[in-house]
């Protein structure tokens, strides 16, 4: 490690130690490549946790940011700004269901807004507080704030934050009978789920499941809330993942790829709930920030293009095939590659169970950046415009990394 790296990393003692970053200082990015301060390049198949959907420093996004930065940075929602109004209109137009949009700065905020909207809607329906339950799913991830982490049905994220807010109920993912059993009492106001669980192991809904959930929501008078913070914005091959299931949600939450790397979140509200929240019912200082909205407008236009959809489909096939070939080359290091589009998870074989984090460290040594989705799954969420050459290079580096790991630790 260079003196520059050591100097920069020494500053980490001033940061609340809630993260455990890789010991690399990244200073520049272009497309699907990033460079550290020593000039070494890395092929980025993580995209800032599915955020940089158009790669690093996309010229159109940079131009939008620079132009808006020279005009107006921030107004708050005490005043209108054109970029946020235009973005809201464009999100409504492309969503195929929404009538209104709430803009915020992160996925957690979008989910908090959705949770509050559900509760407000139930109250407006005359439902007692005990009849405003929100059902979520084991393995889910909806954010880190107190309500969102309670909606996240994973104890490891909740430990030590008790007492948690009430009014949530957990059921098994992809288990329609369990969901109906949780709803039959008539106290459920909403069902909230990810079409593909990200942190839960890159686990997609089974075919037809969302339609069954929609039917149960209609039967028992509940809203359907879809968290597309990670799987939305073109990542699965369609702009919204729910399009592939042909269901109509009541609420959809977005973030990550919506800003192409600039912080922004959004909650989209359908006709049943669009007028529930009126003046003073909710708010945010930074939501709808002109710079974030200006960038998101360009990102949305590009992510909704047929070119991006076609590239996602083509590169998904190539990535899946490459992972399966690598697995076979090393005696079946993966038992399964699952997911949709460019949101794929490679499930580690029993011999390597629990070793995802260690594999990621070796991958960095070989110049490829990955993620994990739990201890047993390697997660791949590259830029949606990743090129043939970039993806091929990433697979070459991954093959070398796994070969190194297997030889060192696989026995």
From Swiss-Prot:
Residues modified as N6-(pyridoxal phosphate)lysine: 256
Cofactors (names): pyridoxal 5'-phosphate
PROSITE patterns in the record: AA_TRANSFER_CLASS_3
A GO-annotated cellular component: cytoplasm
Record: residues binding N(2)-acetyl-L-ornithine: 144, 284
Family from the record: Belongs to the class-III pyridoxal-phosphate-dependent aminotransferase family. ArgD subfamily.
Protein name: Acetylornithine aminotransferase
Upper classification of the organism: Bacteria, Pseudomonadati, Pseudomonadota, Gammaproteobacteria, Lysobacterales
Gene designation per UniProt: argD
């Amino acid at each position: 490690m260079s003196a520059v790296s050591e100097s920069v990393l020494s500053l980490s003692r001033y940061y609340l130690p809630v993260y455990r970053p890789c010991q690399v200082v990244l200073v520049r990015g272009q497309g699907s490549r990033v460079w550290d301060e020593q000039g070494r390049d890395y092929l980025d198949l993580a995209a800032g946790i599915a955020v940089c959907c158009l790669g690093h420093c996309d010229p159109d996004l940079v131009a939008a940011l620079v132009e808006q930065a020279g005009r107006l940075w921030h107004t708050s929602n005490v005043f209108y700004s054109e970029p946020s109004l235009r973005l809201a209109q464009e999100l409504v137009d492309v969503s195929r269901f929404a009538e209104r949009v709430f803009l915020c700065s992160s996925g957690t905020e979008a989910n908090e807004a959705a949770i509050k909207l559900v509760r407000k809607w139930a109250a407006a329906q005359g439902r007692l507080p005990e009849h405003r339950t929100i059902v979520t799913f084991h393995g889910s991830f909806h954010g880190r704030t107190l309500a969102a982490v309670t909606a996240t049905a994973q104890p490891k994220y909740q430990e030590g934050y008790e007492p948690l807010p009430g009014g949530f109920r957990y059921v098994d993912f992809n288990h329609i009978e369990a969901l109906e059993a949780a709803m039959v009492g008539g106290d459920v106001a909403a069902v909230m789920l990810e079409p593909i669980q990200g942190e839960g192991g890159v686990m997609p809904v089974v075919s037809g499941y969302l339609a069954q959930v929609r039917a149960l929501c209609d039967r028992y008078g509940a809203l359907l809330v879809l968290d597309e913070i990670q799987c939305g914005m073109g990542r699965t091959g369609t702009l919204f993942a729910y399009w592939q299931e042909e269901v109509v949600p009541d609420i959809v939450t977005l973030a990550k790829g919506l800003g192409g790397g600039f912080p922004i979140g959004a909650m989209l509200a359908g006709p049943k709930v669009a007028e529930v929240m009126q003046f003073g019912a909710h708010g945010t200082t930074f939501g709808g920030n002109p710079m974030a909205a200006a960038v998101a407008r360009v990102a949305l236009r590009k992510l909704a293009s047929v070119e991006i959809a076609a590239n996602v489909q083509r590169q998904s096939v190539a990535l899946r095939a490459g992972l399966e070939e690598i697995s076979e080359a090393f005696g079946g290091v993966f038992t399964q590659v699952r997911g949709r589009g460019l949101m794929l998870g490679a499930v580690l074989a029993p011999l390597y169970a629990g070793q995802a984090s260690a594999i990621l460290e070796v991958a960095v040594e070989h110049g490829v950046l990955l993620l994990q989705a739990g201890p047993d799954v390697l997660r791949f969420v590259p830029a949606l415009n990743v090129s043939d050459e970039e993806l091929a290079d990433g697979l070459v580096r991954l093959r070398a990394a796994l070969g190194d790991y297997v030889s060192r630790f696989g026995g």
